[in-house]
């Protein structure tokens, strides 16, 4: 059964809705240009309110490894999702700091997936849609056919435009380790719809 991550959490209320729905992980976005950005103190408060067993993931874009590890320590993160142009060295340094690493890859064409080979120290790879100038939050799926050779891989998380209506199809097509959604589960940027979150998790785990 695919793991489910609900990203872009900005409040205790939304975090508890996600956890109650059965999400395996929640994501906190620390990228300053994101409408879903959350401050470190708020993320720490939310993290402390979550029940045990729910993974805490911090989303960073081109943040120095030392700062990633500092924030992770304060918030209590289990994973850093590196969603920018970080190279293998940055991944290695974060991993050596004792934090799990999810390296995001923006899928533009089949060649995008060859990037996986550059990051042997990443724990997981999150496949997201490519859009010029955007680091996540595109709200659109990538071409799943491009990733069919990765079907069943134990280190792939599918993201990008997943909804309660299409997440089951993505899982059946790619059989990933996990799925991730953010903007498609919102009433407004940074505010989750409890109904959409519950439907998404239910569909993913059906």
Swiss-Prot record:
Classification of source organism: Bacteria, Bacillati, Actinomycetota, Rubrobacteria, Rubrobacterales
Molecular function as annotated in GO: phosphoribosylanthranilate isomerase activity
Pathway: Amino-acid biosynthesis; L-tryptophan biosynthesis; L-tryptophan from chorismate: step 3/5
Entries under NCBIfam families matching the protein: PRK01222.1-4 (NF002298)
One GO term of the biological process aspect: L-tryptophan biosynthetic process
Organism: Rubrobacter xylanophilus (strain DSM 9941 / JCM 11954 / NBRC 16129 / PRD-1)
Gene3D superfamilies listed in its UniProt record: Aldolase class I
CDD domains xrefs: PRAI
Catalysed reactions, semicolon-separated: N-(5-phospho-beta-D-ribosyl)anthranilate = 1-(2-carboxyphenylamino)-1-deoxy-D-ribulose 5-phosphate
Acetylation in keyword set: no
InterPro entries given in the database record: Aldolase_TIM, PRAI_dom, RibuloseP-bd_barrel, TrpF_fam
Record keyword Isomerase present: yes
Protein name as catalogued: N-(5'-phosphoribosyl)anthranilate isomerase
E.C. designation(s): 5.3.1.24
Pfam families: PRAI
Homology family: Belongs to the TrpF family.
UniProt keywords, alphabetically: Amino-acid biosynthesis, Aromatic amino acid biosynthesis, Isomerase, Tryptophan biosynthesis
